[in-house]
Amino acid sequence: MNQLIDEGHKLNAVFGVHINDTESYPEAKGFNEELVDPTKRGWDWLDPSYFIKQRPDALSGRRYERFKELKQKAPNLDYIYVDVWGNQGESGWASRQLSKEINSLGWFTTNEFPNALEYDSVWNHWSAEKDYGGTTTKGFNSTIVRFIRNHQKDTWIISDNPLLGGAEFEAYEGWVGKTNFNTYRQKTFAINVPTKFLQHYQITNWETTTAADGQIYGTIKLANGAEKVTVTQADANSPRSITLNETEVLKGDAYLLPWNVNGQDKLYHWNPKGGTSTWSLDKKMQGKTNLHLYELTDQGRIDKGAIATTNNQVTIQAEANTPYVIAEPDSIEPMTFGTGTPFKDPGFNEANTLKNNWKVFRGDGEVKKDANGDYVFSSEKERTEIKQDINLPKPGKYSLYLNTETHDRKATVTVKIGGKKYTRTVNNSVAQNYIQADINHTSRKNPQYMQNMRIDFEIPDNAKKGSVTLAVDKGNSVTKFDDLRIVERQTDIMNPDKQTVIKQDFEDTQAVGLYPFVKGSAGGVEDPRIHLSERNEPYTQYGWNGNLVSDVLEGNWSLKAHKQGAGLMLQTIPQNIKFEPNKKYTVQFDYQTDGENVFTAGTINGELKNNNDFKPVGELTSTAADGQTKHYEAEIIGDASGNTTFGIFTTGADKDFIMDNFTVTVESKK
């Protein structure tokens, strides 16, 4: 995390941590009955939460000690996002004290609800995301407060002041299911850049009227030292105009806005209609003879060439709804994808990445945007093979994870360390991606089967070279790869002996996801209700406060499903566990559940199209009476198709299911 922060700061990014000081969860290291009231439950998704005794927590100094611990672990963090706080109500002294603690450690404060932490918070989620949350909690509408603090905060009702605008939040990487980068780009440059330009200045004069629909029109003047800004709009049928020192920098929806970051001057241009427009340069850009126009894309800047200046004016030919920046070439730094990882551009996001970062041996592979707007490496039909040499981390045990999708077409991933090869193949992706916050999540219109594939390998002391190869056989369907990631491995769970396919105790804290499982179709595309639960006795265990299950069965970690909706809850996939055709396997695991006739183990051959495709194997009965762990064991035979998977089905009752020590063994040959 610290590396991410330090590298991100070079790109002018800021980083925060999401906290909750209203509720606490039993897994939290600071959780105890002194912190929370066990009789008052809060949000209940991955686990039940309990309301914190906020005043005692503040007065005791324990909360501040937790903040100081965070500061020690992430010294360059920029801000704290306070979730829930105030529960859509005011909280007086408690809010001021919370912010005092946050600010004293060099962080600024942001939060969820506009009507809490008003004095100190500079950004509210429910204000910034117009379509999220309640319609009556959308920010401050006070003209007096905005007059005083417009340059300090993004906490306003952003749709009632066309003069000043408002910073609007738009997701494109999976939050609330959104993946449209074009919408994000549109709101950034059409709405947010003009808003932020005005926030570089303080309001000095406010002469407006309020229309019948609540919209504010007229003239607002702003200043920052000698720099003077005026924004005007007469009514809803008139264009907005912004001038800087009497030079028009925005007219209607088009603009050429001056910007200065770290001493470097540039000009942002946006014209929703496109075409040719002429603009006067502000004083800082006048006299510069080496200005270039750059198109801004999600793969970096595209140099459109030098732009001529005549009488301190520039004429720009722009595409509609396309952002540009005018700057001197020596102020443009190249973008590097994959900093701090063994890979160059592990997500295929760089322009010309195949040419620059990979060796292409054969095939029709290319990087393209998929239906969700994500750049992926895609092979259409031909036999395809690409390879990248990697920067080896220190000697040790590692796992390569990458997103993979293929259909009736063999895909092979090979890690080569020195002279040793580690290979994994998959012929068919049978499980759609139901993780809402994953940009690769599925939809009815655009089914997505991208799921993690894992290859375990070791780096010996004398290793000097390493590579990763992605290969696809010839076929009639599209195969995709994306998001390569190498993590250090703490356990050996795959093929520890000749008969054992996997022995997963979930104790590897470096591991990614729920391996070898993925979220099934239960609940549809949503934030999952399944996670790896960490032991924190007695609070996570059977008996405390009426707990009917232990969240951790053995060791420090177990897999927990909490109140999951009806359907296929968990399943393996062929790229993680391959049940070979006609071979006999024994599947076993330990479990607890408070549900009787709620959870069922079984198999699926291919994709689950309807519930009848799930074939129950064995029983999972309640352990709630005594809290004693039970053991499941069953034999299954791999289908001739090679597409057999194992999973857990639920009827959807508000019950929990805990799994540990998941093991698959294959019958030995006699």
Residue ranges with predicted function:
Residues 348-380, 510-558:
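Extracellular glycan-recognition surfaces and repeat-rich motifs
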Residues 37-42, 46-47, 57-78, 85-338, ...:
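Active-site-proximal substrate-binding groove within the catalytic cores of carbohydrate-active enzymes
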